[in-house]
Regions:
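Short, small-residue-biased leader/transition segments that mark boundaries at the very start
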Residues: 1-2
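Alpha/beta-hydrolase-fold catalytic nucleophile elbow
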Residues: 6, 32-33, 53
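Gly/Ala-rich beta-loop-alpha elbow adjacent to hydrolase catalytic centers
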Residues: 7-11
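Short glycine-enriched nucleophile-adjacent loop
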Residues: 12-23
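A conserved short beta-strand
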Residues: 24-36
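Short, proline-enriched alpha-helix->beta-strand connector loops that line the catalytic pocket
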Residues: 44-50
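C-terminal catalytic histidine-bearing segment of alpha/beta-hydrolase fold enzymes
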Residues: 53, 59, 76-132
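Short alpha-helix in the alpha/beta-hydrolase fold that links the catalytic acid
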Residues: 61-79
Length: 132
């Protein structure tokens, strides 16, 4: 059984805490328009893939918290000796430019990010291609 999880906004904060406690319960985690509030070590030790997606000008969080979490996880993987290509299979940082939203008639990156991201074929392909 493959369990994939998505967390959007406050749900992403909550899900990051779950990932920080028991990431082995999930095949992969997609964090949308949120920030990471959980621990990092167990995620790295379990090798559970994580995909961060957020608008570059997200009105609620901004993109910096996602960048910070990605960099922290990336650093921990490097400390374990993983190559960049191995890390790229486990960790994605996808900061969408404003044009991603405006090309779809959207001006509110945070409020509409969740609905756009779950309809984005490349993001969903990443999520559903992950197996354990």
């Amino acid at each position: 059984v493959y369990k994939r999880q998505e967390g959007y906004s406050g749900g992403g904060e909550t899900m990051s805490r779950v990932m920080g406690m028991q990431p082995e319960l999930y095949t992969a985690y997609l964090q949308c328009s949120s920030q990471w509030d959980g621990a990092y070590d167990k995620v790295v030790n379990s090798r559970t893939p994580v995909y961060f997606v957020i608008g570059e000008k997200d009105e609620y969080y901004g993109s910096e918290p996602s960048r910070k979490a990605y960099n922290e996880l990336h650093s921990l993987y490097r400390q374990q000796g993983l190559s960049d290509s191995d890390i790229d299979k486990l960790l994605v940082l996808d900061i969408k430019p404003t044009s991603y939203f405006t090309s779809k008639g959207i001006t509110n990156q945070h409020g509409y990010g969740g609905s756009l991201f779950v309809r984005d074929e490349s993001i969903m392909n990443w999520l559903f291609a992950k197996v354990r």
